Regions:
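Local sequence-structure signature of Cys/Sec-based thiol-disulfide redox active-site neighborhoods
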Residues: 1-33, 106-142
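Short, charged/polar "capping" segments at the starts of alpha-helices
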Residues: 15-19, 46-48, 126, 154-157
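N-terminal non-catalytic structural scaffold regions of very large proteins
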Residues: 21-77, 96, 110
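Thiol-based oxidoreductase modules, predominantly thioredoxin-like and allied folds used
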Residues: 34-46, 141-158
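Compositionally biased, intrinsically disordered or flexible polar/acidic segments
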Residues: 50, 129, 158-161, 169
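Short, hinge-like loop/turn segments at secondary-structure boundaries
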Residues: 56-57, 164-166
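Non-catalytic, surface beta->alpha helical segment in thiol-disulfide oxidoreductase systems
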Residues: 62-96, 165, 170-201
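Phosphate-interacting basic helix/loop segments used at nucleotide- and nucleic-acid interfaces
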Residues: 102
Length: 201
């Protein structure tokens, strides 16, 4: 690991079923290396900080490197999501995405903000692929932010986005991707989100 990575854990112990588990996991991960720092904040008491990091639900983990890359995990990153979470910490620390050069160039062409939400479950073997791509896109481009959300912990979002299977990716509240897709297809959908809604609706 090259640079320090901060894991900002937002919790609300009294009303959040899995906040304690998420907080303990962040503590354990922060003990793996002196380059990983775990910080815990109360979603209500520290609401200004939560708003500053665009945290709107808990448990939430913001992963911060040299700067805030807009990468968030909502839930407890266990199961198949654990490896993708750890890989992302390493990528942030080393500022490495391992994306194809063509993908990097396409990300450089983005001119409008892109919000990627990847809905996952911990028992889904393909979800970590979609999550990993979203993480890396956000790390590569300042205009991309990525939320990975364990839909089993936020069932109201499952209803809102009509999630029947995972992974399901929602880009800018308009474009939906069902399943894990290759890097080239993923970036194509991201670029599509740059067009006016009338073009892709």
């Amino acid at each position: 690991m090259k640079d320090e990575v901060r894991l900002l854990m937002f919790t609300q112990e009294t009303e959040c079923a899995h906040c304690k588990e998420a907080r303990e996991l962040v503590q354990e991960i922060s003990e793996l290396s002196n380059k990983i720092k775990g910080e815990t904040y109360d979603f209500v008491k520290d609401n200004e900080k939560a708003r500053g990091y665009k945290i709107d639900k808990v448990p939430a983990i913001a992963m911060i490197g040299k700067k805030d890359y807009g990468i968030r995990y909502y839930g407890v990153p266990l199961g198949y999501e654990f490896k993708a979470f750890i890989d992302n910490i390493l990528n942030i620390s080393n500022e490495a995405t391992n994306l194809k050069e063509g993908t990097k160039r396409q990300l450089e062409s983005i001119t409008k903000p892109v919000h990627i939400q990847v809905f996952v479950t911990l028992t889904c073997p393909y979800c970590s692929t979609a999550a990993g791509l979203a993480y890396r896109f956000a790390l590569e481009s300042d205009l991309v932010r990525a939320d990975v959300i364990d839909v089993s912990e936020f069932p109201h979002l499952g209803q809102k986005y009509s999630i029947m299977g995972v992974p399901k990716t929602v880009i800018n509240e308009q474009i939906e991707i069902v399943g894990a897709v290759p890097e080239a297809q993923f970036i194509a959908h991201v670029l599509q989100a740059q067009k006016p809604p009338s073009i892709y609706m």
